[in-house]
Regions:
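Cytoplasmic-side transmembrane-helix entry/capping segments in multi-pass membrane proteins
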Residues: 65-76, 93-101, 121-132
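N-terminal membrane topogenic signal
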Residues: 5-23
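Membrane-embedded alpha-helical segments in integral membrane proteins
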Residues: 2-3, 22-36, 54-55, 77-85
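Short, hydrophobic transmembrane alpha-helix segments
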Residues: 30-44, 57-65, 86-87
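Pore domain of cation channels
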Residues: 166-224
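Structural signature of hydrophobic alpha-helical transmembrane segments
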Residues: 34-50, 93-105, 169-174
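Pore-domain transmembrane helices of cation channels
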Residues: 107-153
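Outer-pore turret/helix-boundary of cation channels
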Residues: 36-38, 48, 139-173
Length: 224
């Protein structure tokens, strides 16, 4: 069992894992919303895929502290999800998503450490940078869920929100359009919290690629 865990960790510490994570994130960010809109099983797939992404974060670092934090957050997140979907009257929807945001932030930090752990610059590192970008979009969607659950309002326009996991379809769409500064205008923020989040995501969307590209170019130059 210990050897299996070591092999699993060795894979997630290698550059090849960036591609696997990219596939998972593309599924979560671009494919899953379509499935959730047309299928009754979309919510289950959303929760399984989200937890799978966070589970991989436990093995993506050699730092005992980060592994412990990631494992604790994953365990709490899993427990809260099971409570909500179990046959009981209890639900901690806001806390569940707050833990999800914390888990995403930790995973972003872990991936940035992997991305810049040495001076190697290759296609896998570019994929790693894309992964962080998509994780930022995921963080934005989870934050919108918290805002909507806490205030009762978040997005307006061509959208009907139900206050359930099905709203992820609209939240990830708005998060991505804000992050990429596309802003089609069909969906818009309706309260201050959502507006400031959209502004924050737009700022990240501009600064993150510039900073990462500059860093990768600097590493390539110093190596050569």
């Amino acid at each position: 069992m210990r050897n299996l865990v070591r092999k699993f960790q060795a894979y997630w510490l290698a550059d090849a894992s960036f591609v696997t994570l990219l596939v998972m994130l593309i599924a979560a960010v671009f494919v899953l919303p379509v499935i959730m809109e047309v299928s009754g099983h979309g919510v289950l797939l959303f929760n399984i895929l989200l937890l799978s992404v966070f589970f991989s974060g436990i093995f993506s670092t050699r730092s005992v502290g980060l592994m412990s934090v990631s494992a604790i957050l994953f365990s709490i997140h899993l427990m809260l999800r099971l409570i909500r979907f179990g046959e009981n009257p209890y639900s901690f929807f806001v806390l569940e998503n707050v833990i999800g945001i914390a888990n995403t932030l930790v995973f972003i930090f872990i991936n940035l450490r992997l991305l810049f752990r040495d001076q190697i610059v290759n296609s896998h590192r570019i994929v790693g940078a894309v992964n962080v970008y998509l994780l930022l979009a995921l963080m934005g969607a989870l934050t919108l869920e918290v805002i909507h659950a806490a205030t009762g309002a978040s997005l307006g326009g061509n959208v009907v929100l139900s206050g359930t996991d099905n709203d992820y379809v609209y939240f990830i769409y708005f998060s991505l359009t804000s992050l990429t500064t596309v802003g089609f205008g069909d969906i818009f923020a309706v309260n201050t919290s959502a507006k400031m989040l959209a502004t924050f995501l737009s700022t990240l969307g501009i600064l993150f690629p510039a900073i990462v590209i500059a860093r990768l170019v600097g590493l390539a130059s110093s190596r050569s």
